[in-house]
Amino acid sequence: MRDGRRGDADPRGGRPPGRPARAGDARDPGELPRHRPRQERSLAALARVRVRVAGTSRSVTEATRELPLSRPWIDDREEELVLEVLRSGRLSLGPWIERFEEEIAERVGAPFAAAVSSGTAGLHMLCHLAGLGPGDEVITSPLSFVASANCFILEGALPVFADVDPSTLNMDPAAVEAAITPRTKAIVAVDMFGYPSELDELRTIAARHDLTLIEDSCEALGARYKGRPLGSHGTDAVFAFYPNKQMTAGEGGVVVTHSKDVRDQVVSLRNQGRSYGEGSWFNHVRVGFNYRWTDVQAAIALAQLEKLDRILELRADAAARYAQLLDSIDGIETPRSDDADHQRSWFVYVVTLAAEIDRARVMESLRRDGVATAEYIPCIHLQPYMREQYGFGEGLCPVAEGIAARTLALPFYTQIDADDQVRVAEVLRAAVAA
């Protein structure tokens, strides 16, 4: 345990369980699980039932099974660790969380980490610690989930949107600098769809104008910028563990930082502003939040972390298959490839349709054929509450708006079957050509 850890765990409760297995112990994270997930076993059994379809023998699953947009990879290891937590009698703010924080910090190359209830919670606390308040302006991406703006709106700050680069889908640094005013206090950079932002340029801009830079890496665990993992570059960053993310705990997030003071304050804020040290359990030194995580979630996350390398590998393989399958379809633009400075961590697989293609018709066709899809993702500034509260409208960020009007998410998850990807490509090809 690192020097200075911690004190928000109740000193009165719970004996720490044995250390969860790590990479290199019983099973290497790059290996597939010893037992297939229960869901997979059920599908495999169903696939053995044969029916006659159009004069040929096809499985029930092949003919009718719906393909979801996402599906977490859960196997026996997650069950095993969760049961250990349940049997320990210590379910929240216990040793499993501390263990996870140590391992995730080591994984991303940051000295400190603090687990929280969601990625949004982590971003909110960093905005709170930045001292943001009414009248302050914060620059962020219009092409992201609403949490990228809600995190500072909760502190009373005003959203300012910088348009995106049409290739990376991240904020264009030139647009960020052009958006700065005397009231600008911070930048929330989003690593969209797992593709790293231009961190060096954004850090230079932030330093030149004395701004706080916060990295929303909620979609980008495992991504690398200039050869180093996101989280290791000195900027406070947040990762998230919703079920569609690279790894999941059901819910949850983690703040990673190079500042012990930031870590300590997040640990206090997440637990109603409690102080640290012996006898301090009911000693509250600041107004805080209930952004606590549970040891049950930490156990799931630890099991996921053991196989994260394999998760990232399988998702990269699936993305490469899609790129090959979709390359010959006219009117479909696949995601940007990696380059020397940017290594994506595959979160979702989102294609962009040509302007002349009717997206609604394509989506209807995919869904009719059992392929889940979604508009991914609408611009934040065009959400109803943004229009009503701030008066935003079309034309504010034309690049982001043009992209958001044409994007389409396809089924994508760690264990997606190659045959299912072929099916998605065939259905999409037919839908686009119709």
Language-model regions: role of each:
Residues 1-59:
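Hydrophobic helical membrane-anchoring modules
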Residues 52-91, 95, 411:
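N-terminal "arm"/small-domain region of PLP-dependent enzymes with the aminotransferase-like
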Residues 98-102, 110-114, 174, 178, ...:
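PLP-dependent aminotransferase class I/II
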Residues 128-217, 224:
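PLP-dependent aminotransferase-like
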Residues 232-274, 295:
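Active-site PLP attachment segment
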